[in-house]
Amino acid sequence: MKINEFIQKYRTVTKLVPGMTSSHTPHVVCNDGFEMSVQAGQSLYSEPREVVDSYEEAEVGFPSTEESLLTSYAENEDNLCGTVYGYVPCTIIDEVIEKHGGIDESKIDIK
């Protein structure tokens, strides 16, 4: 499963006021146990910065272990597991997912 498919399947969107939304996607959990937050939408480090069906770039946050494919996007390179990674190309996110064995949908925490 690619990240855009994951976002479409699991994201929840809440309309706050006309023209403003809040969106949340549960953590991506990979088959080898690697986890990361991947978010896209208004007020997030994504492209586009709207609620759409497909993204070019998304915000990654708080990976469970350091991931070399993400390092150059880190806001804080001194705390790679406790920072946000802005505007990460979805192709890179897909590479990270593939590197870690794909998404384990049985472990997705749907609230």
What role is predicted for each listed range?
Residues 28, 34-38, 45-46, 60-62, ...:
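Generic hydrophobic secondary-structure signal
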Residues 41-80:
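Acidic, aromatic-enriched beta-alpha/helix-loop junctions
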Residues 67-111:
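Low-complexity intrinsically disordered segments
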Residues 7, 11, 46, 56, ...:
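Compositionally biased, intrinsically disordered low-complexity regions enriched in proline and serine
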